[in-house]
UniProtKB/Swiss-Prot annotation:
Name of this protein: Acidic phospholipase A2 daboiatoxin B chain
Active site: 55, 97
Species, as recorded: Daboia siamensis (Eastern Russel's viper)
PROSITE patterns: PA2_ASP (PS00119), PA2_HIS (PS00118)
Enzyme kind, highest EC tier: hydrolase
Compartment(s) of residence: Secreted
Leader sequence residues: 1-8
Any one biological process term the GO annotation gives: arachidonate secretion
Main location: secreted
Protein's UniProt keywords contain Lipid metabolism: yes
Any Pfam family the entry gives: Phospholip_A2_1
């Protein structure tokens, strides 16, 4: 994710994250650990960072569109995010974002401020495989 030249999907992803959390901002995940932010390498630092690793892997499996640029449809039903639309690629991107938002919520207790604005150069371990 990159804030410069922000496109549609980043805003949607931010809204999904914020919808699943109370008083916790999407921006706390930018440049967190080894995988939250643009790119990624090494071993995820904690469960929160692993959410980003899994999200990156999910995006890598999406075929037929650019996950970081597309806009998809979704709604909230009884407190749950529901991905909509007929396009399989857009639904897949939405599902990646939905699962990540839930993962962040479920792992809020692992969030460690020492990994905020973490340098990718400190992620020297061998990268995990998707």
């Amino acid at each position: 994710m990159c804030l410069i030249g922000v496109e549609g999907n980043l805003f949607q992803f931010a809204r999904l994250i914020d919808a699943k959390q109370e008083a916790f901002s999407f921006f706390k995940y930018i440049s967190y650990g080894c995988y939250c932010g643009w790119g990624g390498q090494g071993t995820p630092k904690d469960a929160t960072d692993r959410c980003c690793f899994v999200h990156d892997c999910c995006y890598a499996r999406v075929k037929g569109c650019n996950p970081k640029l597309v806009e998809y449809s979704y709604s909230y039903r009884t407190g749950k995010i529901v991905c909509g639309g007929d396009d399989p690629c857009l639904r897949a991107v939405c599902e990646c974002d939905r699962v990540a938002a839930i993962c962040f919520r479920e792992n809020m207790n692992t969030y460690d401020k020492k990994y905020m604005l973490y340098s990718i150069f400190d992620c020297k371990e061998e990268s995990d495989q998707c």
